[in-house]
Amino acid sequence: RGLPVDVASFHRRNMMRNVLKDGLALEQDSGLNPFRPGFIGSTDTHTATSGGAMEKNYVGHLGSRDATFRNLQDHFVSNPGGLAVVWAEENRRDAIFEAMRRRETYATSGTRPIVRFFAGDYDENLCESTDALEQAYAAGVPMGGVLERSDDDAAPRFFISAQRDQGTDLYPANPLERIQIIKGWVDDAG
C-alpha cells in the first residue's frame, strides 16, 4: 500500500486527460469527437451524508465496515467525496440542466473553491476590467465549451478566476496555493 501512489502505475484510461486527448485525435481523423464530457463530482457513500465532502468530518464510506479510525486511513483511493459545481444563470431546474448541457461544470472534492475558466482571444488587460466575465463570455468560451481555431492560428489566452473555499469558524480554509492547467494536444506524432 505504499504511499504516495505512482501515477504512472494507473492505466492510461484512469486519467480523463487521456480520454480528452483521444477525442481530439479522433476528431482530427474523422471530424467527430465523441469524448466531450462535462465534469461533475459526487459522493458515493452509504452513510446518508450527501455533500459531506470535508476531510476533517469524513465518517467513512460504508458505515459499520470502516467506522474505526484505522480503517478510515486504510484506503488511499478513498476520500470524503466529490461535489458538482454547475454555472447556471439562476437556481432553477431548466437553467441548471441547460448549464449541464453546455458542460459549464466542474468537480471538486473536499474544499469548495469558486473557479471560472475561459479561453479565447482576450485583451491582455482583461483581469483589470470591471466587466471581465462579460468580456470573457463575449470573446471566448467558458469551461466545457468548444474552442474553435483562430483565423491566424494564434494561441488562445486563458482567463481564470479562482476564489478559495471560505471554510467555517471550526474549520477555516487554507489559501489557494496554485492553479494547475493540464494541457493536451494532438500533433503529427499522435
How would you describe each model-predicted region?
Residues R1-G190:
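C-terminal functional module detector
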